[in-house]
Swiss-Prot record:
GO terms for biological process: angiotensin-activated signaling pathway; connective tissue replacement; fibroblast activation; fibroblast migration; fibroblast proliferation; gene expression; heart valve morphogenesis; inflammatory response. This is Protein Noxp20. It is found in: Cytoplasm. Over-expressed in brain. Also detected in lung, stomach, and in a lower extent in testis and thymus. Coiled coil: none annotated. The modification Phosphoserine is found at residue 262. May play a role in neuronal cell development. Its main location: cytoplasm. Pfam families: DUF719. It comes from Mus musculus (Mouse). Residues 1-87, 102-126, 165-208, 404-439 are annotated as: Disordered. It comes from the Eukaryota. InterPro entries: DUF719.
Length: 569
């Protein structure tokens, strides 16, 4: 083909290229506009269309004449990207042969490619719409739950009469946090796409929607859990405070429980107080304090041990009763009640006939009676210490009374023989004889309190030994009702002996202190009577501590008779 023919063909191709933008297909317009050198723009292409650019460039290289392609290469080489990035797919060398005829088949892939580019964006828009709808729904649910919890807490505070304004600040914190979460995520401001940016592809839109939904669900769960726990804690605390303040019996019951103490605790406290008082006084003489003397003779220790034994026996009785039911339970209850009635009858008898107590008995008579009663209990206990204490108390009282009577007789004879001046000369002799045998009022008072404390301590010790032997060392089993009656006789004899001793002590005080003033003598006499009454009370309380011990003994005896109950131990 000649040169003229080539020029003619080139001109024809140029005219065809100029007429192509007038085509009706929008896909062809877009493709040709991108391929033309005049359409080169300095604006950066979106990231979503970076993958489409190499294909379009290749297609343009195939359908563009060499002259135009060279010009586009030169212009592209002169221009640099705005972002400073150089892409490898921007310039593609045309190595294939260029056809001068228009390729009609290239129009169809361009249309399909354009449709493929449009479909992901529309799909992403639909995903973003669903994401915003879900986030708005969860946000509204979170806000509703937060407001509900706040309303519950406010209602509880109003019901419990809580008017403190400071309590409102911690209550409003969870609600503000929930409102802040719901306010940051709104349907109008979608975090997956900006207001002016094009929609992302389908995969990016779905990932953004899922992450947003996950964050909202996590925040909602945290707010619901935290708010619920705070509400429950708030209601519980305020309820307990109101109950403690409004219940009239709550404080009274608590006070009574704190004041409830045992007899041994009271005696120990009295002992400690007396020690503190004596520590402040720099005295060497022995003082007549009943609590300290009672502890010196180990009465307090035996009383505490008896209390512990009684409490353990009581717990055993209760645990055994819970293991029974029906007829067996009723029979056992009747037996235990009958044992208790014996002790109750003894208390009422002591209150009704207090004048029968305090019958005077000699030390030998009391020792004989005590030995017989212990033998009836079938326990190997000998009252040696108690008998010695009783004998010691009776001996010094009798000795003091004899000395006082001799001194009184001598004084009366001398008064009859001599009068006037002779009386003045004989007064020193009377003082010498009296000082040798007779005791002073303070000494008699001291011996009285000491004897009462020693005798009472020995009585408590004897009852403690009897309780131990009833539980663990009986030679022969005896019905609990009979043992209860014997124990009542034993404690009655002890109380009568203590009362008799206190009366003897007061008589001795009155005789020795006949020359003393009433202001000095009467407090001593009253103190001896008071300590004697306290001693009998301690012995009676120790008897009541033996009731659970006898009940346990009866349960064991009944179990041995049945010989078929595994609960017996």
């Amino acid at each position: 083909m000649s040169d003229d023919a080539r020029d003619t063909i080139a001109n024809g191709v140029g005219e065809d290229a100029a007429e192509m933008p007038n085509s009706d297909s929008p896909a062809e317009d877009a493709a040709e506009v991108q391929c033309g050198p005049a359409t080169t723009s300095n604006e950066p292409a979106p990231d979503d269309h970076m993958e489409e650019q190499p294909e379009i460039t290749a297609m343009c290289a195939e359908s563009t004449p060499p002259g135009i392609l060279d010009q586009s290469k030169a212009s592209a080489a002169d221009e640099t990207p705005l972002n400073g990035e150089v892409t490898e797919d921007t310039l593609v060398e045309c190595v294939d042969s260029v056809s001068l005829e228009g390729d009609t088949g290239s129009e169809i892939p361009l249309k399909e490619q354009d449709d493929a580019a449009v479909d992901p964006s529309s799909q992403a828009g639909r995903w973003a719409g669903w994401g915003s709808w879900g986030k708005s729904l969860l946000s509204s649910a979170s806000a509703t739950v937060g407001h509900g919890l706040t309303a519950v807490k406010e209602k509880a505070g109003a019901t419990l009469r809580i008017h403190s304004a400071n309590s409102a600040s911690p209550e409003g914190a969870p609600t503000d946090a929930e409102n802040g979460i719901s306010g940051n995520v709104t349907p109008d401001q979608d975090p997956a796409r900006g207001p002016h940016t094009p929609p992302p592809p389908g995969a990016a839109g779905s990932r953004g929607m899922l992450s947003a939904l996950t964050n909202v669900v996590q925040n909602t769960g945290k707010s619901v859990l935290t708010g619920g726990l705070d509400a429950l804690e708030f209601i519980g605390k305020k309820t307990m405070i109101v109950l403690a303040e409004s219940d009239p019996g709550f404080k009274r019951t608590k006070t009574l429980m704190e004041r409830t103490v045992s007899l041994s605790q009271m005696l120990r406290e009295a002992k400690e107080k007396e020690k503190q008082r004596l520590a402040q006084q720099l005295t060497v003489e022995r003082t007549a304090h009943y609590g300290m003397l009672f502890d010196e003779y180990q009465g307090l220790s035996h009383l505490e041990a008896l209390e512990i034994l009684s409490n353990e026996s009581e717990s055993k009785v209760q645990s055994f009763l819970t293991s029974l039911d029906g007829e067996k339970l009723e029979l056992l209850k009747n037996d235990l009640i009958s044992i208790k009635d014996i002790f109750v009858a003894k208390e009422s008898e002591n209150e009704a006939n207090p004048e029968e107590q305090g019958l005077e008995e000699s030390g030998e008579e009391f020792a004989r009676m005590l030995t017989e009663l212990l033998f009836e209990l079938h326990v190997a206990a000998t009252p040696d210490k108690l008998n010695k204490a009783m004998k010691k108390a009776h001996d010094w009282v009798e000795e003091d009374q004899s000395v006082v009577s001799i001194d009184v007789a001598k004084g009366s004879e001398e008064e009859e023989k001599e009068e006037g001046k002779e009386e003045k000369a004989e007064e020193p002799e009377e003082d010498k004889t009296g000082g040798q045998g007779a005791k002073t009022v303070e000494e008699v008072y001291m011996l009285s309190i000491e004897s009462l404390a020693e005798v009472t301590a020995r009585c408590i010790e004897q009852l403690h030994k009897v309780a131990e032997l009833i539980l663990h060392g009986q030679e022969e089993e005896k019905p609990a009702q009979d043992q209860a009656r014997v124990l009542i006789k034993l404690t009655t004899a002890m109380c009568n002996e203590v009362t008799s001793l206190s009366k003897k002590f007061t008589n001795s005080l009155t005789t020795v202190g006949s020359n003393k003033k009433a202001e000095v003598l009467n407090p001593m006499i009253n103190s001896v009577f008071l300590e004697g009454s306290n001693s009998t009370t301690y012995v009676q309380d120790a008897l009541q501590l033996l009731l659970p011990v006898l009940q346990v003994s009866h349960i064991r005896t009944s179990c041995l008779k049945a010989t078929a109950q595994p609960d017996c131990s």
